[in-house]
Structures are given as structure tokens and as C-alpha cells.
Swiss-Prot record:
Gene Ontology terms, MF aspect: 2-aminoethylphosphonate-pyruvate transaminase activity
Pfam family, one: Aminotran_5
Protein name per its UniProtKB record: 2-aminoethylphosphonate--pyruvate transaminase
HAMAP family found in the cross-reference section: PhnW_aminotrans_5 (MF_01376)
Length: 377
């Protein structure tokens, strides 16, 4: 894959992007220009099609990081007297709870171990114990540890019980199958700098038309008002406030490449090969994954840190970076870990190369894995 000489980002976003995506940012755009507004409209149409939401859902783009759009979705979809159940098995679930608190939306935390997925049975029990809950906010792929939560089961449960569902699909959209016809949701949130392989700076909410229409007046914020953003765009074809023009242009290029590659099935298969290659190679070095294979998403893998006293993450990170690879620190609360991402404009050859680099660093630091020095790959 052609990228240039930049370090490889093995993170859950920002990601390593293709040269074509980078080149798309070399042109300046007028934010009110018809050509730019055509790009925005085409993006929204394609994003809705990816989840088979034609006729039922619309796309509302939003400036800022993905968290801006998560907050916008909760603020608009959940009425001010609503109540949100948050199945919590990681750092990004915790962020949703914090958003609810700041917004003044009542919330209920459903604690789940960090190495286990949410389950429809646990969620149903929580919903039946508290009938005042109106919505469930579910992270699809919790990249704190890399757990893939069972979206379809949870979506069908919410539909059966008449509860609204907001999905944080930040790290799954474009890689894991999501079908609005069989996984009904009120709103689903993702962003440019994840599995479509764009650059950070814009999020988007795929929201049911009737839910969006009913959300007028719910938002606490002018800038994050999805209803107002959508209505204004429909009337004028323009963004309400200055859009991230270069980000939008790069996302159009990234989405074109996504579709040319074969869309979600092919993109997801590449990430799965990356993940499998990484896990196999790291196991040969003596590393253990934090998660069992059955719940591991092919997005980011959490590894137990070496038990050797000579291990120090900052030193380990710096030495791996010198070899051209940027890792991610762990986000777990109980055990020391680090994370390696499998997504971005990379393939399984890069995963083999990073395993080789990590093996070199272990030997340079004199770190023993399972009672022996790491062997050369």
C-alpha cells in the first residue's frame, strides 16, 4: 500500500492514510461553493447506503472529533426528561456516562467486566428493573480493550421493548457489518478518521428521519444541534458554520477508495487478516492477548505488558517508534497493557514488520518473555 515515508500509526485513530487521501487536501475549497456542497451531499448519501438506511435514515455531518457527534446524538435524540442505560465495559462507555452527566440527562450504568461483551440478557434485565429508562447508548466496538459488543442482539431487544438505541460505531463503521434493516437503531455515530481511513475532524450521525424530526428543541447547544444542522443543510445545501473543508475533501477520497476496494466486507476482511497476523506473530514472541479470541474485534488488540522488570512502556514505545511504528498505551484499569491497532491503510505485511520491530526492541532492552529472550522473527 502506497503511503510515503511517514511512521505507521498502529492506533484506533487517527490512522495511517493513503497518499491519495493526503493529496486530496492540497486543494482549497470555498465553504459556500456549489462544488464543495456537492461533495458533502454525496458523502451523506454514500454513508446512509453503507448501512442500508435509504428511505429510513439521514446523515447529519458535524464538525469536530467523533466525541462531538456522540454528544450531539445524545443531546438531540434523548429528550431532556429521558433516561439512558449505558452498558459499561470500557473507557468509551465511561465517556458516554460523562456526556450524559454534563448534559443533565439521567443515566444508569450497567457495569460489565472489561474483557467481556455486553449481553442482551443483562441489558433486558436492567431495562425491566427500571421502566423509566427510555434509551440505550451502546458502544459497538469498545476499543479500550478491543471488545466487540453484540449489536444486532441489543438492537432487536431495544426494538422489542420500545427503547431508543444510540450506537457509538466510531471504531466499527465500515469494517464490521451494520445493517439498519436488521439492526434497528435511532442514531448511529461514526467519524472520518476511523475505518473509512480519512483524517480526523468530522463526525456524522445516521439518524432515523422520524426521530430527528421529533428532536427539535432537545439540544442544549447551538453548535451541536443536529436538527438545526440538518434543516439548514436541506434548505441551503450548506453547513451552518464553517466546515472542515480539507477534511471533507479527504473523506470523499477515502470513501471512494473504500468503495473501490469492495466496501465493508473487503475492508473488514483486510483488517481481520491484519489482526490474525499480528496476534500470531506476537504469540510467537511470547505475548498474551488480554481478550479471548471469541470477543476480539479486528480493530485493535490489547496485549499484556511483559512481566520483566526491565520493561518500561515509554522506552518500549520510543524504540518501536524509532523503527517506524507508533503504538498505543493501554486503557485498562486493573492490569498493565499496551495496544496495537489493525486498521488504516496498512496490510498484513506491515503487521509482520511491526512484529519484527517489537522483537528487535525486546532483545535490545534485554526483556525476557516467558523465561527467555525474544527470538528473532
Amino acid at each position: 500500500m502506497i503511503r510515503g515515508n511517514d511512521p505507521i500509526l498502529l492506533t484506533p485513530g487517527p490512522l495511517t492514510t493513503s497518499l491519495a487521501t493526503k493529496q486530496a487536501m492540497l486543494r482549497d475549497w470555498g465553504s459556500w461553493d456549489a462544488a464543495f456542497n456537492t461533495i458533502t451531499r454525496s458523502l451523506c448519501d454514500d454513508l446512509v447506503r453503507i448501512v442500508h438506511g435509504e428511505g429510513t435514515h439521514v446523515c447529519v455531518p458535524m464538525q469536530g472529533s467523533g466525541t462531538f457527534s456522540v454528544e450531539a446524538a445524545i443531546a438531540n435524540v434523548v429528550p431532556r426528561d429521558g433516561k439512558v442505560l449505558v452498558p459499561q465495559n470500557g473507557a468509551y462507555c465511561q465517556r458516554i456516562l460523562k456526556i450524559c452527566k454534563v448534559l443533565g440527562r439521567a443515566s444508569v450504568e450497567l457495569p460489565i467486566p472489561e474483557d467481556q461483551p455486553a449481553s442482551a440478557a443483562l441489558i433486558e434485565d436492567a431495562l425491566r428493573r427500571d421502566p423509566s429508562i427510555t434509551h440505550v447508548a451502546q458502544v459497538h466496538c469498545e476499543t479500550g480493550a478491543g471488545v466487540l459488543n453484540p449489536l444486532q442482539d441489543i438492537a432487536l431487544l431495544c426494538q422489542r421493548l420500545g427503547k431508543g438505541l444510540i450506537v457509538d460505531a466510531m471504531s466499527s463503521f465500515g469494517a464490521i457489518e451494520i445493517d439498519a434493516r436488521t439492526m434497528p437503531f435511532d442514531a448511529l455515530v461514526a467519524a472520518t478518521g476511523k475505518c473509512i481511513e480519512g483524517v480526523p475532524g468530522m463526525g456524522f450521525v445516521l439518524v432515523k428521519k422520524d426521530v430527528l424530526e421529533a428532536s427539535q428543541g432537545n439540544s442544549h447547544s447551538l453548535a451541536l444541534d443536529l436538527h438545526d444542522q440538518y434543516v439548514y443543510m436541506q434548505k441551503t445545501t450548506q453547513w451552518r458554520f464553517t466546515p472542515p473543508t480539507h477534511v471533507v475533501a479527504a473523506f470523499r477520497a477515502a470513501l471512494d477508495q473504500f468503495l473501490e476496494e469492495g466496501g465493508q466486507p473487503v475492508r473488514g476482511a483486510r483488517y481481520r487478516r491484519n489482526c490474525d497476523t499480528l496476534v500470531k506473530g506476537m504469540a510467537a514472541l511470547g505475548f498474551r492477548t488480554f481478550l479471548p479470541t471469541a470477543v476480539q474485534a479486528p480493530i485493535i488488540v490489547t496485549f499484556h505488558a511483559p512481566a520483566d522488570a526491565r520493561y518500561d512502556f515509554k522506552t518500549f514505545y520510543a524504540k518501536v517508534r524509532e523503527r517506524g511504528y507508533i503504538l498505543y498505551p493501554g486503557k485498562l484499569t486493573q492490569v498493565e497493557t499496551f495496544r496495537v491497532g489493525c486498521i488504516g491503510a496498512i496490510d498484513d505485511n506491515e503487521m509482520r514488520n511491526v512484529v519484527t520491530a517489537i522483537g528487535e526492541v525486546l532483545r535490545e532492552m534485554g526483556i525476557e518473555m516467558q523465561g527467555r529472550l525474544a527470538e528473532a522473527a
